[in-house]
Amino acid sequence: MNAQPQPAAAPRPAANGRGSRGSRRPRRPYDAVVVGAGHNGLICAAYLAKAGRKVLVVERRHQVGGATTTEEIYPGFKFSCCSYVVSLLRPWIIRDLDLPRHGYEVLPLEETFTPFEDGRYLLRDADPERTKRAIARFSPRDAEVYKQFGQKMGELGRLVKPMIDGPAPDPLTHNPLEILRLAKIARHVRGQGEEWLIGNVKMMTMSAVDFLSEWFECEQLIAPMSVSGIIGTFLGVRSPGTAYVLLHHYMGEIDGSYRAWGLPKGGTGAIAAAIAAAARELGVEIRLQTPVARLAMKNGRATGVVLENGDEIAARTVISGLD
């Protein structure tokens, strides 16, 4: 935008009625700019648009999705490159954005198969009795405990889920409403009893292997179960805190079925595509191959984004979907 010099002319009134061009304030065409078109950024943008806001999403790559992408990394074959299963996408988001109408479909994941070097294998599926018999081939004791473990983790999940679904608590707040919410959480936790508190502390701090070893004895069961504690992390199964990630697999939900996981038809990229379609229908503008260089700042506040090509996009709110 290199404007050529123009002959002098009488100043025109500015849009704000103050006279000269130099006194004009920059236009703010967007209420919000979302940086990154991952599934979280797209959902945020869709809800803002649903509330009547004018929203722009800018994405560096050639497609939406972030960690929820399906790509043809080998000719003729498409893969979910990062996230590959779905379950923690909240049911009300699916309903609010009418995602099935935009192509969202999940196929239940009912079996997990683990082969071993000695030729044996462990097959766990939706039939509890069949799973029990499969585990009993390695450890009759673990076969009996397996159901109890699932029930206990399910109970922990039901208690923790409301805290996850709400805003993160701020222990330093002076807001009376926030203090009241913290008090309710504290009362809720305290009311569960000492055994629950001890179990919860262990789950939050222990490694997946150590936590599972308190329940089970055979490595053929502990090994495949512990892998669930490192999905989405850069940790190992013996890293502290991975037992909490394991809990997520007992908090899943598909079509009202608790503790369920599924494979998205078309790969996880199909989920992002469905959310993007819903967002566009609500009026969200999505620009691909539009990398952001930095935030535009004024008096310590973000006023927009500056693209790598030098263009500046102003907005009242800037939301980062970067990780």
What is each residue range found by the language model?
Residues 1-33, 50-51:
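Extreme N-terminal leader/targeting segments of oxidoreductases
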Residues 25-172:
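N-terminal glycine-rich phosphate/pyrophosphate-binding loop and immediately adjacent elements
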Residues 27-30, 307-317, 321:
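Core beta-strand elements of the Rossmann-like FAD/NAD(P) dinucleotide-binding domain
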Residues 39, 289-293, 309:
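Conserved SAM/SAH-binding loop
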Residues 154-282:
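Active-site/ligand-binding neighborhood in enzyme catalytic cores
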Residues 278-292:
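A conserved beta-strand/loop element that lines the FAD pocket in flavoprotein oxidoreductases
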Residues 288-303:
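A conserved short coil-to-beta-strand element within the FAD-binding core of flavoproteins
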